[in-house]
Swiss-Prot record:
Hydrolase as UniProt keyword: yes
Lineage: superkingdom: Bacteria
Pfam families on file: Lactamase_B_3 (PF13483)
Protein name: UPF0173 metal-dependent hydrolase LI0883
Family: Belongs to the UPF0173 family.
Gene3D superfamilies: Ribonuclease Z/Hydroxyacylglutathione hydrolase-like (3.60.15.10)
NCBIfam families hit by this protein: PRK00685.1 (NF001911)
Classification lineage: Bacteria, Pseudomonadati, Thermodesulfobacteriota, Desulfovibrionia, Desulfovibrionales
C-alpha cells in the first residue's frame, strides 16, 4: 500500500499508511503557509514534536486533547507540555523518551535522533519513522548539518528525508543537498522554506545542488497544502 505525504507548510507534515496517520510539528495556528485549521485535517494517531519553538510545537496540545492522539517528544519538553495542559497519559512513556531511544506504537516504529538547534525545554530532536508498511522516513526537525547523518544512511534504509533548507535558523540549500548525500535517502522533500521573509523563498537552489551532489536521490516537488502518494 502506498504512503501519502501531506505538507501543511513549514515543517508540518502528515504521513499516512495502512490506516495510520503520523503528524509532525503541527504548526497550524498563525502558520502563513497553511490554509487549514488543525481541526480540519485527518485525525492523527501519533503527534511528534521535534522541539518546543512555537512554529513546531504549534497546536499539539489542542490536537492531542481533542483526538486522543499519542504525543511523542523528548524528556523535559514533555514536562512543559503537561504543565500547559497536555494529559500525561497521552505522552508516550508518560515522561517522553530520549535521543537514541526507539519506541513502537500502533505499528509505527520511531527512533529519536539528535539535532543541532535550540529548545527552551529538553533538547531539539529528529525522528526516523518506519510506518506499518515499512516505509521509512527521516524528519530531523530544525538542524544544521552534522556528520552522524552519514551513520543514519548506513544504519537505515531511508525511503524519504524531509530536510530544512531555509538557512538562518537551519542548514541552507547547499548543506541540505550534502546531507541528502550522506543520508543515502532515495527521495527528498525540502521543508522550512518560504514561511517567513528571513528564510530561503524557493527550493530551486536546493534542487540544483541536489542534482550535483546526490543525483541518485529523487527530488520530490511539493507546495504547502498539497499531498503526494509515494
Amino acid at each position: 500500500m502506498n504512503t501519502t505525504i501531506i505538507w501543511h507548510g513549514h515543517s508540518n507534515f502528515q504521513i499516512n499508511a495502512n490506516g495510520i496517520s503520523v503528524l509532525i510539528d503541527p504548526f497550524f495556528t498563525n502558520n502563513p503557509r497553511c490554509t487549514k485549521n488543525w481541526n480540519e485535517i485527518q485525525k492523527p494517531d501519533i503527534v511528534l514534536i521535534t522541539h518546543d519553538h512555537s512554529d513546531h510545537l504549534g497546536d499539539a496540545i489542542a490536537i492531542c486533547k481533542s483526538t486522543g492522539a499519542l504525543c511523542g517528544c523528548i524528556v523535559g519538553t514533555a514536562d512543559k507540555l503537561i504543565q500547559q495542559g497536555m494529559p500525561q497519559h497521552l505522552i508516550i512513556g508518560e515522561i517522553g523518551f530520549n535521543i537514541g531511544g526507539t519506541i513502537e506504537r500502533k505499528g509505527v516504529r520511531i527512533t529519536m535522533t539528535q539535532s543541532f538547534h535550540t529548545s527552551e525545554s529538553g533538547s531539539p530532536a529528529g525522528y526516523i519513522i518506519t510506518m506499518p508498511n515499512n516505509f521509512t522516513l527521516y524528519h530531523p526537525g530544525d538542524t544544521g548539518i552534522f556528520q552522524t547523518m552519514k551513520t543514519f544512511g548506513k544504519l537505515y534504509n531511508l525511503h524519504l528525508s524531509l530536510l530544512p533548507i531555509g538557512g538562518f535558523f537551519t542548514m541552507d540549500s547547499y548543506q541540505a543537498a550534502y546531507a541528502a548525500k550522506m543520508l543515502k535517502c532515495k527521495m527528498v522533500i525540502p521543508m522550512h522554506w518560504g514561511t517567513f521573509p528571513v528564510l530561503e523563498q524557493t527550493p530551486e537552489r536546493f534542487k540544483n545542488y541536489l542534482k550535483a551532489m546526490a543525483p541518485e536521490c529523487k527530488y520530490i516537488a511539493m507546495e504547502p497544502n498539497t499531498s503526494k502518494e509515494l
